[in-house]
Amino acid sequence: MARRSRYISLAAVMATLLSALGVTFLLGQGRAEAHGVAMMPGSRTYLCQLDAKTGTGALDPTNPACRSALDTSGATALYNWFAVLDSNAGGRGAGYVPDGTLCSAGNRSPYDFRGYNAARSDWPRTHLTSGSTIQVNYSNWAAHPGDFRVYLTKPGWSPTSELGWDDLELIETVTDPPQRGSAGADGGHYYWDLALPSGRSGDALIFMQWVRSDSQENFFSCSDVVFDGGNGEVTGIRGSGGTPTPTPTPTTPPTTPPPTHSGSCMAVYNVENSWSGGFQGSVEVMNHGTEPLNGWAVQWKPGNGTTLGGVWNGSPTRGTDGTVKVRNVDHNRVVPPDGSVTFGFTATSTGNDFPVGTIGCVAP
């Protein structure tokens, strides 16, 4: 009972987060890239995003390591927590990804994840029991076939030392594991059982490399854990030690239900440029299906104090509850398989440039 009062179970944390989890962004236009990172045990980017998420669209991490990473890498990386990727890795690891950069995809990602390489002992962590079997959950925002290589740091590794390939030993490789939930939907994930080595205690790190078999693109994930008899509890994030509250409820809940993933359509959000009192943003609409997407619409609620101005390559409407819905225009109505289109907008803002809760595809 004492242990349960000190820890938050990851399942409870995920249930609270995923009800209001914001979709993050992917730069560019044309080919749709995959997304994915470890959710159990939670990666640094996943748990820091959970810790930082608020009900206003602002990021306010309570964990000092997450705060430092946000200061170093900015909001773009944290909102894009499931895109620690290298488009050209092709299964390469040691000798290709430099030591000290494993948690940022060798600094080859389109996004700046350098801050998540920091060698420090105060990252959010998952509490595990040596010799037990856990179920790994790995986000499937864009599902693709391939292998998941799972590594564990060797005994004696310290979280305050740089993470290198010599610190790791491969403990499992899983090919095409099953999935729960839809790709591109809140909570959707791959899952499989992982037998943890016996005789371990203290701090460790689980490193995963997702090697796609249909592309050269690979994903990288660093999950801080401690072998102390735990059962998947998470500490070091907002609400630790009591009832989990990673995402405070907005003072005025929206009357319009949050958007849901629509078929193979996925929407990803980007702040292109910002200035005092406003910003320029874009939304990429991605088709992860095998058939053309004929017509699309995207819905979100802007951050508190944010008002959309002009919109191009899309047709906007505004709800009475503050939500925004943008539909296709004639020239970008059809999105080809594994393709994407992008619309842009300007907005006035008091600093909350990102959406409150989820942005997603809805019926046109």
Swiss-Prot record:
Keywords: Carbohydrate metabolism, Cellulose degradation, Copper, Metal-binding, Monooxygenase, Oxidoreductase, Polysaccharide degradation, Secreted, Signal
Its EC number(s): 1.14.99.54
Positions bound to Cu cation: H35, H144
Disordered: region residues: 234-261
InterPro entries, alphabetized: CBD2, CBM2/CBM3_carb-bd_dom_sf, CBM2_carb-bd_dom_sf, Cellulose/chitin-bd_N, GlcNAc_Chitin_IntDeg, Ig_E-set
Cofactor field: Cu(2+)
Domain named CBM2: residues: 258-364
Signal peptide: 1-34
Superkingdom classification of source: Bacteria
GO molecular function: cellulose binding; copper ion binding; hydrolase activity, hydrolyzing O-glycosyl compounds; monooxygenase activity
Domain annotation Chitin-binding type-4: ranges: 35-225
Pathway: Glycan metabolism; cellulose degradation
First-level EC class: oxidoreductase
Catalytic activity: [(1->4)-beta-D-glucosyl]n+m + reduced acceptor + O2 = [(1->4)-beta-D-glucosyl]m-1-(1->4)-D-glucono-1,5-lactone + [(1->4)-beta-D-glucosyl]n + acceptor + H2O
Biotechnology: The purification method developed for LPMOs can be a cheap, simple and fast solution for the purification of these enzymes for industrial applications. In addition, the activity of SamLPMO10C shows the potential of LPMOs in lignocellulosic biomass valorization.
Compositionally biased residues, Pro residues: 245-260
Alphabetized PROSITE patterns for the sequence: CBM2
Gene Ontology CC entries for this record: extracellular region
Biological function: Involved in the degradation of lignocellulosic biomass. Catalyzes the oxidative cleavage of glycosidic bonds in cellulosic substrates via a copper-dependent mechanism. Degrades phosphoric acid swollen cellulose (PASC) to oxidized cellooligosaccharides with degrees of polymerization of 4-8. Also shows activity on agricultural fiber paper pulps such as flax pulp. Is not active on chitin.
Official protein name in the record: Lytic cellulose monooxygenase
Upper classification of the organism: Bacteria, Bacillati, Actinomycetota, Actinomycetes, Kitasatosporales
